[in-house]
């Protein structure tokens, strides 16, 4: 299983690898990009998970494919050494390599869908990004199966790349949080890369002015563009355990994101009993309709009003906290792992005969 230690893919892959290992599988978790720090390594406690570092470039950081020859050699040698039964790729380009084992690709994100959501696409016509686009499309077609973490993002991928097989949807999942304290604290929490336009933190900064409660934002702050921070309290890039601890105490969690293929931090906040205020985008509607307040991500005034309303209405806030917690149980790690195990079994069953990707239908 490939992964990266830069964003939410690490949380997803560490959780899934741990669940698969607990079910008796041996997982070789191969890191592409910068190596994980000690806190992230500590998330891998099962001895049946072997962590392998590659020193290869991340797909979106090597749009022109300069690193591809080294990556191809690295993975060919690794497959020859390990002799895996299944190749689970959490990026696209590696699906174009010559694998012996059946290959599944998970579409966690892509540069083209990010650009469209952020209305920032002019640079995608550059030659290196055209190369990236062709590699993504080829990887989806070359894989024996491909997966999306939400139906909404599945539809986006289909519209952008027209893959030859229909793909399937397996929702991400997490282990349940510890029971939240009896009394939540009166603060609002958000999380995301401040420099990432998709996270829309600048809208939250504008909406934060005049709120009765403090608004804390966790996430990396380096290299982000200058903007008016409003009344946000920036608390930096917390460890995963520290962020989940904050969620245990936060009364409200807000994500005004313009783009989110799934949103693991929202799920973690819901599991911790936070009331959710979310941007009205298809992914969040799919996953949280009826269990959150929704606002137009382009309407700062509506975002301010929604947050002010929940700060002042104890009954509605408590109702949404319960609704989010109950909905989060739908997205369990156990259910996700079982869906992937079923997918792997179908891939193995087709290995010895003519393979047709359309035959695979696995849903969580």
Say what each PLM segment does.
Residues 180-199, 205-212, 216:
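Conserved donor-binding/catalytic core segment of Leloir-type glycosyltransferases
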Residues 111, 125-146:
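Membrane-proximal helix-turn-helix segments that form the acceptor-binding/catalytic region
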Residues 258:
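Aromatic "clamp/platform" in nucleotide-sugar-dependent glycosyltransferases that forms part
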Residues 141-142, 154-174:
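Helix-loop-beta element that forms the nucleotide-linked donor phosphate-binding surface
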Residues 3-6, 22-65, 153:
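N-terminal strand-loop element at the rim of the active site
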Residues 86, 98-121, 126:
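Active-site proximal beta-strand in glycosyltransferases
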Residues 140, 245-250:
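Short alpha-helical donor nucleotide-sugar binding micro-motif in glycosyltransferases
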Residues 236-237, 278, 292-301, 309-314:
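Conserved acidic donor-binding segment of nucleotide-sugar-dependent glycosyltransferases
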């Amino acid at each position: 299983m490939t992964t990266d230690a830069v964003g939410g893919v690490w949380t997803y892959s560490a959780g899934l690898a741990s669940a698969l290992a607990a079910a008796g599988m041996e997982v070789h978790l191969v890191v592409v990009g910068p190596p994980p720090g000690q806190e992230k390594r500590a998330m891998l406690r099962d001895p049946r998970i072997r962590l392998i570092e590659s020193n290869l470039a991340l797909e979106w950081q090597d749009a022109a494919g300069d690193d591809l020859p080294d990556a191809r050699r690295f993975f060919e040698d690794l497959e020859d050494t390990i002799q895996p039964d299944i190749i689970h790729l959490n990026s696209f380009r590696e699906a174009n390599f010559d694998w012996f084992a059946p290959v599944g690709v998970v579409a966690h994100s892509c540069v083209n869908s990010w650009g469209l959501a952020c209305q920032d696409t002019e640079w995608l016509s550059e030659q290196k990004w055209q190369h990236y686009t062709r590699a993504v499309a080829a990887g989806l077609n070359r894989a024996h199966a491909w997966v999306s973490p939400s139906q909404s993002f599945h539809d986006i991928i289909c519209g952008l790349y027209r893959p030859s097989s229909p793909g399937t949807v397996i929702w991400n999942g997490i282990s349940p949080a510890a029971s939240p304290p009896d009394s939540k604290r009166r603060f609002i929490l958000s999380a995301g890369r401040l420099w990432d336009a998709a996270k829309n933190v600048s809208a939250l900064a504008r909406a934060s002015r005049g709120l009765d409660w403090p608004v804390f934002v966790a996430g990396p702050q380096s290299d982000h563009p200058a903007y008016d921070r409003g009344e946000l309290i920036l608390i930096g890039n917390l460890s995963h355990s520290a962020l989940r601890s904050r969620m245990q105490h936060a009364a409200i969690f807000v994500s005004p994101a313009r783009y989110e293929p799934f949103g693991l931090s929202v799920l973690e906040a819901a599991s911790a009993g936070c009331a959710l205020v979310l941007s009205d985008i298809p992914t969040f509607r799919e996953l949280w309709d009826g269990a959150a307040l929704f606002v137009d991500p382009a309407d700062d005034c509506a975002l301010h009003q929604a947050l002010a309303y929940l700060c002042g209405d104890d009954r509605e806030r408590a109702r949404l906290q319960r609704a989010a917690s109950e909905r989060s149980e739908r997205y369990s790690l156990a259910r996700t792992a079982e869906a992937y195990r079923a997918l792997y079994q179908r891939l193995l069953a087709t290995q010895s005969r003519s393979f047709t990707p359309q035959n695979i239908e696995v849903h969580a």
